[in-house]
Amino acid sequence: MNVVQSVDSVALLPAYLAAGTAVLVLITDLLVARPRATLAVAALGALGTAVGSALVGAGAERRTFCVGADCSWIFGGRAALVAVVVALLTVGVLGLSVPALRTGRSPVGEYAFLLACSMTGGVVLGAAGDLITLIVALETLTLPLYVLVGLRRGSLASAEAALTFFVVSVVATTLTLLGAALLYAVTGGLHLDRLGALIAEQPELRDLPLTTAAVAVLLVGLAFKVAAVPFHAWAPATYDGAPLPVAAYLSTASKLGGLVALLAVVQRALPADQTGPVLALLAVLTMTVGNLVALRQRRTVRLLAWSSVAQAGYILAPLGALALAAGRTDEARSAAYAAAIAYAVFFVVLELAAFAGVTALRPAGADGGTLDDLRGAARRHPWRAAAFGLALVGLAGLPPGLAGLFAKVTVVRALLDGGAAWLALVVALNAVIGLAYYLRVTAALWAPRPLAAPNVGGAAAVPVVGVVGVVLAVTTVAAVVLGVAPQLVLDLAGR
């Protein structure tokens, strides 16, 4: 008897669209050889992927590649949310890349192809139902970024950042695969739901030293991916050395992918009593170290990089509560899951808006510069600076950045419901620390520039490329909409 079900092509439509985009970009670059056409195909393909994912996710949950009740592909509302966010992020990053690509320092075809490949990994990741699919999708998301970070010609900083990112990612991937192999050795299964059921039904498996080692190694490997402290050292140097649009993608799509993978294994596969304390400790270390080090940063991208480390801590906090909430109500566990996903989506929108603001305020192809380069930017570019400032106060969790405020409130409420009041207090204290550097950058935008300041990049008026302005406007509007109607994300995250 054939126990393998037929393939559901509708469920796989988002993956088809994403992978097809990568192929079409290659063909367009080869046959048409016009950068504008190549970028247009990549952007339209990403938009098509977002639309297709939304349409498939709007219906009932679809499963395929199943053996019995265990499926390797599960596409529902949450998977659709991740796929749509990753696809739209790709469109935004392509738009931010236009000024840098016009300088000719990066090949357009390869650049767009690598972004499309990374998008494919992100789309598959949200629907992964087993460890192999999960890890392959995560690496498909990450591998193209090694090249994108170092693709800028003649830049030693980019080459060093790419090498650092590659070495650290190899270690992370090795640990993740080792953890998966050890779990397979213990349970004989790879499907996430099956792993969770086996460990729950057989307490003797959970108590094995090999199971503890497998959980620890797997968590460490995924912690590298999200730049959680103490596995974070690669992130600031990599972000600062990468081109601005690539740094934006790294701090959003790449981090979202790692968090989705971590959330999937914590919620569905790993024993909660082992993961809870570890994730809670990682969350405290990550948000505290990220905020404290960000206070001392003078370079814009490094500050955003350290702030993204801190933001990862806020997202990890509900995962600790999710594990600690085991044995409590299903509602508490669902709230923790929804809080983590919702915060990640809010963060991604605000972080992309922040990077769009930096790109709009800097000369084409330039790096993020220093905070001094941004002084007085609002006097020269009031609307761009206002959008950038809105993103910063949103990341800080202050009005009028209501999206960030609701994100933090959602996390704190989930922690309280999960019985982790002490962790909620740590989140609140760190949010106060974060106010210092977010408001410092925001204030610098409106501060007068010293009369003796040299006229370096950012000191004079910078003409904005139209598509960068569009990305900045769209992300700002999205942040405002999510702030006014956060339930749009919370409902999907809770499904």
Where are these regions (language model features)?
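Alpha-helical transmembrane segments of multi-pass membrane proteins predominantly involved
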Residues: M1-R495
